[in-house]
Regions:
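OB-fold nucleic-acid-binding modules
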Residues: 1-174
Length: 174
């Protein structure tokens, strides 16, 4: 499996691939054999031919935002959040269930929440979620009318501060 660090320049060979949409997200893939989907996954053995690393890695710093500040312009961007934690009901859970990609929920001090989506194939999928509060960064996505954060590596979570009690509404009122 190819892995690209954030900021890696890549070339994509698109000949023979098709654009499709799924859950409000545009994707590039193979022609789909299933009429439910507009395109399919690129076979694993084709990935090294279709995606090639180019010279140079651009140093990337995430934009630090509040959950309430998320907008469509941030989709596909490397972003970060401070003073966040996973919701109480998910403490003790792994980043991902073993049988399917999974959703977890991040909350900030104002009570705003964001879905965190983790692939069951992520190297850190079986590790427990951080139990404290702190900093988390990832790539923002959009699926079925909801923002979702894709964390690249568990090291992108520095959440060792004490937990907080979120406000009851998203206006920051008690």
């Amino acid at each position: 499996m190819l892995a690209f660090p954030i900021g890696q320049r890549v070339s994509v060979r698109c000949q023979g691939l098709v654009l499709g949409g799924y859950g409000g997200w545009v994707s590039l893939g193979t022609a789909s054999a299933n009429p439910v989907y507009q395109n399919g996954f690129i076979p694993q053995d084709e990935i090294p031919v279709r995606l090639r690393k180019r010279e140079g890695i651009e140093a990337m710093r995430p934009d630090t935002l509040r959950i309430a500040e998320l907008e469509a312009v941030h989709v596909g961007c490397f972003i970060a959040f401070e003073n966040v934690q996973f919701v109480d009901g998910e403490l003790g859970s792994a980043w991902c269930d073993s049988d399917a990609d999974s959703d977890r929920h991040l909350v900030d001090e104002r009570g705003d929440t964001l879905l965190v989506r983790t692939s069951r194939y992520a190297r850190f999928a079986t590790r427990p979620l951080p139990a404290g509060s702190g900093y988390l960064e990832g790539i923002l996505g959009w699926f079925n009318k909801s923002y979702q954060l894709r964390v690249i590596d568990a090291r992108n979570a520095v959440m060792d501060s004490p937990r907080f009690i979120p406000c009851m509404d998203s206006d920051g009122n008690d």
